[in-house]
């Protein structure tokens, strides 16, 4: 946001003057950083003639080469939107420095020999292959600065004479590892044995409690059975007594009834009748005496 008129998008002029005053900005987070932001950052080094923003990189065209080199020296490796910028002169691509284990891409070898180096993208023409390959080369170099994670060392083949020593070394290592594993296994077995003993103690305590409860239940059952038998005997004895009393009462009643209605009673009735006859007739006694 400089307040100046907006610069053009043309940064692809092929004259030597414009190429030498052109700055390449790589590793740019174009999703966040816009053209206005780039112009605001780089306008302090000199007048900007053109600025073109692409996906992941951008170009800034200055009026003079001195301004472009000042921008490269001042803004290279600056962190914007979480990414360090890779800034270089567009006319002087970063020289390729081969590293051990890395191969140079074929596109970098045949970049200058392309028959169709200029393509039309977004309404204007620029050397796409040249800057794309140069940008990715710089990007790979930047990522190559970060040390890779350590890789497992593959043992080289040795002659048969040294095989015995390696086997012995392996044997010693395996024995050491075996001792460590046995030590860890012994500690684990000790822990397991302690846990088993505690569980065994708890189980024995539970068993004793259950046995005591069962004994109490048996005692209660025996007491209940004894009480039930005693009650049963009492009921039987009471029933027998009641039966005996009933039988004795019946026998008493049967013996008392014939005594009341026997011969004495008939004699009394007869005498009573005689007396009545005697009283009524008056002289009946005399008649009996005469007889």
From Swiss-Prot:
Identify the keywords attached in UniProt to this record, alphabetized.
Coiled coil, RNA-binding
InterPro entries listed in its UniProt record: hnRNP_C, Nucleotide-bd_a/b_plait_sf, RBD_domain_sf, RRM_dom, RRM_HNRPC/RALY_subfam
Map out region (Disordered) in residue numbers.
171-192, 249-291
Q: Which residues form the RRM domain?
A: 21-92
SMART domains documented for this protein = RRM
**Is Kinase included in the keywords of this UniProt record?**
no
Q: Which GO terms describe its cellular component?
A: nucleoplasm; nucleus
Per the record, the coiled-coil ranges are 190-249
Q: Which PROSITE patterns match?
A: RRM
GO molecular-function terms, A-Z: identical protein binding; RNA binding
Name the domain of life.
Eukaryota
Q: In which tissues is it expressed?
A: Widely expressed, with highest levels in brain.
Compositionally biased region (Acidic residues): 257-282
Biased composition range(s): Low complexity: 177-189
Similarity field = Belongs to the RRM HNRPC family. RALY subfamily.
The protein, known as: RNA-binding Raly-like protein
Provide the species name.
Homo sapiens
């Amino acid at each position: 946001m400089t307040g100046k008129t907006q610069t053009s998008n043309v940064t692809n002029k092929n004259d030597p003057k414009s190429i030498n005053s052109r700055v390449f900005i790589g590793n740019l987070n174009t999703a966040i950083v816009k053209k206005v932001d780039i112009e605001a950052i780089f306008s302090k080094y000199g007048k900007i003639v053109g600025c073109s923003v692409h996906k992941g990189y951008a170009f800034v065209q200055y009026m003079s080469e001195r301004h472009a080199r000042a921008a490269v020296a001042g803004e290279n490796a600056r962190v914007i939107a979480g990414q360090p910028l890779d800034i270089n002169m567009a006319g002087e691509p970063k020289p390729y420095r081969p590293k051990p284990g890395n191969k140079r891409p074929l596109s970098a070898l045949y970049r200058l020999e392309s028959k169709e180096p200029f393509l039309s993208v977004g309404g204007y023409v620029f050397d796409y292959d040249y800057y794309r390959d140069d940008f990715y080369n710089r990007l790979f170099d930047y990522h190559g600065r970060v040390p890779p994670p350590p890789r497992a060392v593959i043992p080289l083949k040795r002659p048969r004479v040294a095989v015995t020593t390696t086997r012995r070394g392996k044997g010693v290592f395996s024995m050491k590892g075996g001792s460590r594993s046995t030590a860890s296994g012994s500690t684990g077995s000790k822990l397991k044995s302690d846990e088993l003993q505690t569980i065994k103690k708890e189980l024995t305590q539970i068993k004793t409690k259950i046995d005591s409860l069962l004994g109490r239940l048996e005692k209660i059952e025996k007491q209940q059975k004894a009480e039930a038998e005693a009650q049963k005997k009492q009921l039987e004895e009471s029933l027998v007594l009641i039966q005996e009393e009933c039988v004795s009462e019946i026998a008493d009643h049967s013996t008392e009834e014939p005594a009341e209605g026997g011969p004495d009673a008939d004699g009394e009735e007869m005498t009573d009748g005689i007396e009545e006859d005697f009283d009524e007739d008056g002289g009946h006694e005399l008649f009996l005496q005469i007889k």
